[in-house]
Amino acid sequence: LRAGTMDEIIDRKTAICDLPRHPNCGLSIDHHKSNEPHENTIENSIILWEPTPSAARIAYNLLKNKIDLSDLSETMIWVDKLDGGSISIDEFKGNNPVLWLGRVIGESEENTTTILENIQNRVSIEEILELPDIKLELRERMAKQEYLNRTIRENLSIIDRLAIVRLENLK
């Protein structure tokens, strides 16, 4: 956004969430202190900023009394942990379905659409992860994650409480 590569498609009908405000957007939702609005508001633009753990929490809180979002309440806990940086290493390395969904969404446009349509239809995350194409993507991502964990373990040294992972000799 800052580089201007999307300027021609951002207009007053564009909503931007969890990214720096764009002068052309109509709705900006953010929680980062660095993006807190002050006097420099944008004319004809709605800016929703709150000091919440995640930008998604702002949207969730705004809509939860207007539409039933109860099926997302558990997911929001994990979204807050991830976006707010309050997730522990053990939680991050764990097998929580929300985390695995987050790791596979966006890998392909087709699977992303399938995931979003199923969430919209209130299909549980566990059921979504069992869909054949999603399950295949998940298996590949789990194997990749194990490879990354093993590579880090094998190349990690701690010197004066500083963790150093040497990756320059990897093939």
In which residue ranges do the predicted regions lie?
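Hydrophobic helix-and-loop "lid/oligomerization" segment in the mid-to-C-terminal part
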Residues: 1, 84-171
